[in-house]
């Protein structure tokens, strides 16, 4: 799906906001289900909806009407194009979509959690997980991977009473795990009391909840004293003994699950990733495709924090191990730092 907007009235900061609203718009259609984001989306159309006459063109009509209605102040006209030819979809993905996503992500390179005065909440996914609340910071984007701190800021400026609310960070409780009284109060209010406290930098202590739109799932791997990460595209087995869908079934739903967390791909290379447990040194396995995607930033972070060169070469993938025993052998051979760290449990 390609939504064309007027350049003169629609700013670059607003486009990701509109794009993420597709999730809500499509899920408002009876008999239609949407999940995912960016270039990893899934749309299901029920047999009843199809029998009633629903066709792909109607998705375009819904998007057109919804965008014109909600963003009428800045969008005076728009065009929705739906591509179904696989070759053309692949071309647009690589020539248009991915370069656009990369440009958006690059805007955050010089921002840190310490350099801003406020964070933002995001509850766009509460239609699926009523108790889930994302806390979006410069160094931890929304777990869907599509809502950065700048995107949340733009959403709030456009609609102060909308899905992204300002969260101040003036009353720290435990900066080691990233727990703030202001954040706890916001999460409790926005989750209707289902969640009382949350940390931003820990997978074991009060981890952030997840809905079902996460790009990746991170889970503790006790044999190697580290964590494994699986991305949505990966269909195989992990050393945790579970596939991505199996991990998703126990991680999503807006419930805190110590030892497991959903997150965006770009959070993997962050200096705040699992900071409370030792950071990215804990990463021992991820699918080869994901490892290649995050390699540059992850290697750079490992070099800056620990002086390790080519850290991703120490991380296992499905080509070397999908069971814990073989993984530990590989990590031992590579001298992975997680093997010498304190136990996580």
Whereabouts are the PLM-identified features?
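Cysteine-centered metal-binding/redox modules
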Residues: 1-345
